[in-house]
């Protein structure tokens, strides 16, 4: 069955917000600018201000061409927002263009820092170490909060999310089809070590007609009880429709492919927290192992070679070892004062965390850091001295606030962080 959201339960199944009765009740009451009980546009944005400058069309936005393939992705170019909106109005389109991975929130902060955000992250997804980390580094002008705008027929190839993070996707309008594979099922699809670019044909699921939607579920049937389909080749997968106003949650390690069945606007976040930081740790270390194998023919164990490994890891994985340790230390430092009772700690977009929540976060940070710092691949990474000293200090501070013997950290056999033995 689909688990409720909990800091102490690892989320194992994808779900759509309409699976939860309170979301269904709120959805019936809500209007077009509300999302599962959470208003996407603030009162001031919706009613009292002129159209934000960010919507006027002069910004450059990333646009993918879904009609072409470039290695294992779709080629991208930059257009003005107004050019893409004009494209959407065309009746005879030559290519299928998809505005995707637009750092909308970062763009708004840069262009209109005094304005309130256009939307607020739902509280279920507000424990977000990844975006908290990037929010405190505005000079990077980066984050993992995206807006997607696509005409009917646009799609995203088969993939798993960056860093093996969680992701959530909220349909402001439109309709999406999702095919999702439980972890490990994707291995049945590998050919010469490669995964398929487009999974629908491989699964024999070209038509969306058999996909499950909240609009077509019989009365009394819960989405939490849905069972996966099985392809002719024995691959288990879920095939679901996401309607306007619904939120899709995708757990770590679930490969998926997504199509826009109608013109669609969605808000999408990738995020890490205590529940999946072990997946992220394991994937980072596996990616580093793969990088070292690629550079094995020039391996000499020198500092220069180790630096090359980290540079390639950053280029292919999106994050190197030092940055990951810094993220963990950042998350811990923010939570230590709150766990001591000295100050309230707020997550993404102002949501406040409980004391128990903070202690759980700290316990997981301690566990992952302790294991990482025991690995030579981490301690011998270049430019790590200051970072390692900070990590040791964080571990000591956490053990002072959350002593393991007092239940502040998982004991033997209790940790499922992904890097513990």
List each model region and its residues.
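Short, charged beta-turn/beta-strand-edge "cap" motif at the junction between a beta-strand
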Residues: 254-256
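N-terminal accessory scaffold of Fe(II)-dependent oxygenases
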Residues: 1-247, 259-421
């Amino acid at each position: 069955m689909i688990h409720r959201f909990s800091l102490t339960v690892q989320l194992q199944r994808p779900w759509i917000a309409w699976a939860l009765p309170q979301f269904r009740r709120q959805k019936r009451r809500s209007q077009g600018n509300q999302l599962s009980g959470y208003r996407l546009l603030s009162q001031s944005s919706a009613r009292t201000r002129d159209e934000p400058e960010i919507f006027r069309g002069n910004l450059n936005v990333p646009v993918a061409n879904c009609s072409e393939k470039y290695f294992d992705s779709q080629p991208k170019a930059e257009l003005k927002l107004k050019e893409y909106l004009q494209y959407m109005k065309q009746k005879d389109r030559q290519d299928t263009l998809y505005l995707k991975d637009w750092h909308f929130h970062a763009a708004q902060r840069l262009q209109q820092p005094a304005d309130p955000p256009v939307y607020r992250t739902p509280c279920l997804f507000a424990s977000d170490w990844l975006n908290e980390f990037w929010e405190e580094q505005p000079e990077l002008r980066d984050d993992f909060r995206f807006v997607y705008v696509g005409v009917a027929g646009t799609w995203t190839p088969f993939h798993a999310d960056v860093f093996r993070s969680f992701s959530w996707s909220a349909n402001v309008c439109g309709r999406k089809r999702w095919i999702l594979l439980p972890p490990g099922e994707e291995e049945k699809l590998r050919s010469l070590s490669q995964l398929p670019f487009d999974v629908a044909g491989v699964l024999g699921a070209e038509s969306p007609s058999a996909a499950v939607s909240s609009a077509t579920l019989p009365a009394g049937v819960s989405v939490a009880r849905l069972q996966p389909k099985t392809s002719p080749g024995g691959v288990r997968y879920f095939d679901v429709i996401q309607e306007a106003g619904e939120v899709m949650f995708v757990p770590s390690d679930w490969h998926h492919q997504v199509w826009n069945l109608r013109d669609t606007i969605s808000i999408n976040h990738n995020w890490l927290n205590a529940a999946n930081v072990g997946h992220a740790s394991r994937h980072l270390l596996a990616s580093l192992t793969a990088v070292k194998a690629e550079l094995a023919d020039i391996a000499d164990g020198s500092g220069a070679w180790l630096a090359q490994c980290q540079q390639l890891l950053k280029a292919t994985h999106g994050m190197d070892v030092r940055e990951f340790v810094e993220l963990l230390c950042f998350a811990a430092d923010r939570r230590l004062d709150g766990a001591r009772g000295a100050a309230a700690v707020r997550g993404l977009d102002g949501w406040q965390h409980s004391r128990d929540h903070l202690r759980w976060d700290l316990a997981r940070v301690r566990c992952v850091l302790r294991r990482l710092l025991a690995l030579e691949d981490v301690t011998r990474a270049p430019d790590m001295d200051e970072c390692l000293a900070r990590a040791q200090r964080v571990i000591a501070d956490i053990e002072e606030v959350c002593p393991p013997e007092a239940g502040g950290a998982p004991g033997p056999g209790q940790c499922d962080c992904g890097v513990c033995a």
